[in-house]
């Protein structure tokens, strides 16, 4: 039984119970684990508790930011990009860097990523997965509502024979010569 359904059966209004469960509050009835019924506890007595993973109680999350700006002296020198490399980046990312503003944005993004070169990673093993050493607690798969395929298909823009239709794939950008012909009066 879901916590929301349990809380509403125990006398909480649906609106209040859903607000509590969305805030991460667990609802228990007296002694026992969350969601268990006990006959000794009146229906109106509920213990509402917040999990210990709240920000105030989590010791792994620092209370203040630990980020410090990196001086420009420690960063590698700024790289100049040949036109061929910019064309390749445009084709792969499907982003247009035709203007000076686009190139400046690209240079700033690369300069920001250069700060990773300063990080000391000696003695740190590479991580294959974020969840590699953790136990994953999964809930049981319970069907909440059934026969809602028609409702879900109505949410899609394109359907064909009760299947979702994916949008068209990436459209490649025109070559540099074609773009040069199109943009004779551009700043780039």
Swiss-Prot record:
The keyword Repeat does not apply. It is found in: Mitochondrion. Pfam families: GatC. It catalyses: L-glutamyl-tRNA(Gln) + L-glutamine + ATP + H2O = L-glutaminyl-tRNA(Gln) + L-glutamate + ADP + phosphate + H(+). GO terms for biological process: glutaminyl-tRNAGln biosynthesis via transamidation; mitochondrial translation; regulation of translational fidelity. One of its GO terms (cellular component) is mitochondrion. Its EC number is 6.3.5.-. Allows the formation of correctly charged Gln-tRNA(Gln) through the transamidation of misacylated Glu-tRNA(Gln) in the mitochondria. The reaction takes place in the presence of glutamine and ATP through an activated gamma-phospho-Glu-tRNA(Gln). PANTHER family: GLUTAMYL-TRNA(GLN) AMIDOTRANSFERASE SUBUNIT C, MITOCHONDRIAL. Subunit of the heterotrimeric GatCAB amidotransferase (AdT) complex, composed of A (qrsl1), B (gatb) and C (gatc) subunits. This is Glutamyl-tRNA(Gln) amidotransferase subunit C, mitochondrial. It comes from Tetraodon nigroviridis (Spotted green pufferfish).
């Amino acid at each position: 039984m879901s916590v929301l359904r349990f809380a509403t059966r125990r006398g909480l209004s649906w609106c209040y119970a859903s607000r509590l469960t969305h805030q991460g509050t667990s609802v228990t009835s007296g002694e026992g684990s969350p969601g268990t019924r006990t006959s000794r506890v009146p229906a109106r007595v509920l213990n509402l508790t917040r999990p210990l993973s709240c920000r105030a109680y989590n010791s792994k999350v620092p209370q203040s930011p630990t980020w410090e700006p990196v001086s420009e002296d420690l960063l590698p020198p700024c790289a100049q990009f040949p036109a061929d490399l910019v064309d390749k980046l445009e084709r792969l990312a499907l982003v247009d860097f035709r203007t000076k503003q686009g190139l400046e944005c690209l240079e700033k993004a690369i300069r920001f990523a250069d700060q990773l070169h300063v990080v000391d990673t000696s003695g740190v093993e590479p991580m294959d997965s974020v969840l590699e050493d953790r136990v994953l607690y999964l809930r049981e798969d319970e069907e909440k509502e059934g026969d809602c395929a028609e409702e879900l298909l109505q949410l899609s823009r394109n359907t064909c024979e009760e299947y979702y239709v994916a949008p068209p794939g990436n459209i490649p950008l025109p070559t540099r010569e074609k773009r040069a012909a199109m943009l004779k009066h551009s700043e780039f």
